[in-house]
């Protein structure tokens, strides 16, 4: 079975289908001042956040219509569009803006929430320690707190009983929501991840959709 075919099955499992592949397209937002769609990169993201002290409207938490065959409580992540959906009853979902894996670090698959934590400890994986001098300083673990890269909350993603090393977590860089910036984890701003953490149960199904990304080995 080809990778493309497998990803199609993942999307069918979610009971929904997104538009054409967007993995190579730059994120865009609507600029109400100029009434134009503009590219949203790291520079513009920092400028917008510094000016407004909040995310662009598209990436703010909101309830939206959402059709899916998945039951309420399921998390569906659209990595290409930078949205996380928490399925709600009545054909709705809570939509959160997210940051996702940068080029070469995106992934797709079906996993579950294995455990959760408040103000989690950050322990960088060996691969990150090897390539990142800053991460190497915390090889034994960085205690939770306002400077911790995992932010205020973390949902740990498992395949069966195995930790995937991927997380849904907060961030100390809220302006990065809407961008491809991480090493594979899904990041939300701290207010949003705190809200999500309060609603999600351990064992919840998590479907990660990202066209053009590598599939997690369990799919």
Question: Where do the model's predicted regions map?
Answer:
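N-terminal pre-domains immediately preceding structured catalytic cores
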Residues: 2-219
